[in-house]
Amino acid sequence: MVAVLGGRGVLRLRLLLSALKPGIHVPRAGPAAAFGTSVTSAKVAVNGVQLHYQQTGEGDHAVLLLPGMLGSGETDFGPQLKNLNKKLFTVVAWDPRGYGHSRPPDRDFPADFFERDAKDAVDLMKALKFKKVSLLGWSDGGITALIAAAKYPSYIHKMVIWGANAYVTDEDSMIYEGIRDVSKWSERTRKPLEALYGYDYFARTCEKWVDGIRQFKHLPDGNICRHLLPRVQCPALIVHGEKDPLVPRFHADFIHKHVKGSRLHLMPEGKHNLHLRFADEFNKLAEDFLQ
């Protein structure tokens, strides 16, 4: 690892492994199960799969939370489900196919998996009878949000993304390779995902994700969705943690430059999970932008 990444890369990898999914227990969800008194959980058939989602709030403004790699609504968005303004917003957090409780099917990563997730997300919200939605997308969920905003502009009201990238560099590819073997992750990081998925599925899916995200490096300019950025029409807020060990600042700058009229907000102490570590600050920022 040292020989491959070099000193800077190893430091970034260590920071990444310490900042991946924090330990949050996820209860096994059934049809219309309740999380406390205010968050409900259910599944709905969308594009041939049963997609799991959680919903809270009673506001007129629908907001969809899109999780990151191996993520789910509850593992990735606990403070948002609990504390976003329930009078102003109806908040939905989804588990993409193959993640969280949206299984079966097993997660796979064809060349168009981000586009598939974007279509699934939009079609889920339409199935739930929302006429228009705003998006909060973290990491892979931010990429999905960008694609959804570009491909379904009449349906997306506003968008907040963080920890996202529109292309893959050599540096990115090496960092992804460094997290392939989950047995090398810290126990604190690994155990919650083992509890959710079981070790075999967790380990296998992480390896498949690394291969899936690295495939973009073989495309011109490492393209994931950079060609779609000029098509985003909705107001967009890009949030970036200056200490993010996974997504360097230049990715946020690139998205900001190519999404017309977007705003860039920097959090000096923020890492990749800034919406969890600084949940109150992030929630206020998102609420102010969405209103």
From Swiss-Prot:
Species, as recorded: Homo sapiens (Human)
Top enzyme category: hydrolase
Domain of life according to the entry: Eukaryota
Active site per UniProt: 139 (nucleophile), 244 (charge relay system), 272 (charge relay system)
Pfam family, one: Abhydrolase_1
Binding site for Mg(2+): 221
Its job: Specific alpha-amino acid ester serine hydrolase that prefers small, hydrophobic, and aromatic side chains and does not have a stringent requirement for the leaving group other than preferring a primary alcohol. Has homocysteine-thiolactonase activity (in vitro) and may play a significant role in the detoxification of homocysteine thiolactone in vivo. Catalyzes the hydrolytic activation of amino acid ester prodrugs of nucleoside analogs such as valacyclovir and valganciclovir, converting them into their active forms (acyclovir and ganciclovir).
Name of the protein described by the UniProt record: Serine hydrolase BPHL
